[in-house]
């Protein structure tokens, strides 16, 4: 009889404890539900007429993706993917014109007039040279949503050489991903204060970046190599190697407020691009030959063609076989063209 009594007490105690716990859990659940409903009601009231919009949502184009900074009238970041195949094509930039991006509200867009006589060039973040795959893809790189005010010498020189290096990486890697954009970094004053100061151009107050960044992620088989670079928006001579401007990815993320390639396992996968590859940009002679080749291709008269070759010789540079053959082919083309009106 005593055993039966003990079992009954234990059963009842367990039942009461379990029931009590269940009631407590139910009360907690109902409280949380009520709290959530109350918060939702408050949130709905706050959101009644909408919340502020930054316009920083991801925008997709044929061959690049970007996020736009409406307050500064420049991109926050521009992302691309390069491969040997995707760099092929016949699109020509002579058919493209800089213009406001139709996807950007008129109130927040930059205009060509902002750059006119400003002392700054219109610098591509996704370069036209990466987009020969189609006329439309190249034309979209001329939208001002992909453009920042850039120092002329930097745009035509160091930054151009960096873009060429990125394209050349597709000869050694199967896939190359790029993220490029502007930075506004502080300068240290004499009194030790760190001050962010930057110029605005045009009636639309387009922000002139103090620096530009480019993050390169290259893949070959299972190898992933990354390099992050921060470049002053100023002239940079041929004596400065690219590695002078290499920074850690975490430092760039701190400067920019962006997280790059979040799906990559950095601890396990990433190698230093400049250790896996050369990070070697074209030197003066190589770059001059490259630019001369572009001028030869675009020459429309024999006089212009000969001027290109004369300038090259005056610089003390001997044309390589590629440029010599390109010159002879272009010369034959222009001679035939000048003969036609006489026939």
Give the residues covered by each predicted segment.
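Domain-level detector for secreted/extracellular nuclease and nuclease-toxin modules, and
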Residues: 2-343
């Amino acid at each position: 009889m005593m055993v039966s009594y003990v079992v009954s007490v234990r059963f009842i105690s367990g039942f009461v404890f379990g029931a009590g716990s269940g009631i407590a859990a139910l009360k907690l659940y109902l409280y949380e539900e009520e709290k959530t409903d109350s918060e939702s009601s408050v949130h709905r009231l706050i959101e009644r007429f909408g919340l502020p919009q930054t316009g920083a949502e991801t925008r997709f184009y044929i061959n690049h993706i970007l996020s736009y900074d409406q307050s500064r009238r420049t991109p926050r970041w521009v992302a691309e993917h390069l491969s040997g195949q995707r760099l092929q094509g016949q699109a020509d930039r002579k058919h493209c014109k800089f213009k406001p991006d139709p996807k950007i509200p008129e109130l927040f867009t930059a205009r060509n007039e902002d750059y006119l006589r400003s002392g700054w060039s219109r610098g591509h973040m996704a370069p036209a040279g990466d987009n020969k795959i189609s006329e439309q893809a190249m034309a979209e790189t001329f939208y001002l949503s992909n453009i920042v005010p850039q120092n002329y010498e930097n745009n035509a020189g160091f930054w151009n050489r960096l873009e060429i290096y990125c394209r050349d990486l597709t000869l050694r890697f199967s896939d190359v991903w790029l993220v490029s954009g502007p930075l506004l970094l502080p300068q240290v004053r004499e009194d030790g204060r760190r001050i962010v100061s930057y110029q605005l151009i045009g009636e639309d107050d387009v922000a002139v970046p103090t620096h530009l960044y480019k993050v390169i992620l290259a893949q070959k088989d299972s190898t992933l190599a990354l390099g992050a670079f921060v470049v002053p928006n100023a002239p940079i001579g041929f004596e400065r190697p690219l590695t002078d401007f290499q920074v850690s990815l975490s430092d760039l993320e701190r400067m920019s407020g962006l997280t790059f390639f979040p799906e990559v396992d950095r601890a396990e996968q990433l190698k230093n691009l400049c250790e896996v590859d050369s990070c070697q940009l074209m030197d003066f002679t190589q770059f001059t030959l490259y630019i001369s080749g572009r001028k030869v291709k675009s020459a429309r008269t024999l006089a212009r063609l000969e001027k290109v070759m004369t300038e090259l010789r005056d610089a003390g540079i001997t044309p390589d076989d590629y440029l010599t053959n390109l010159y002879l082919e272009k010369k034959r083309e222009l001679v035939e063209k000048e003969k036609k009106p006489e026939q």
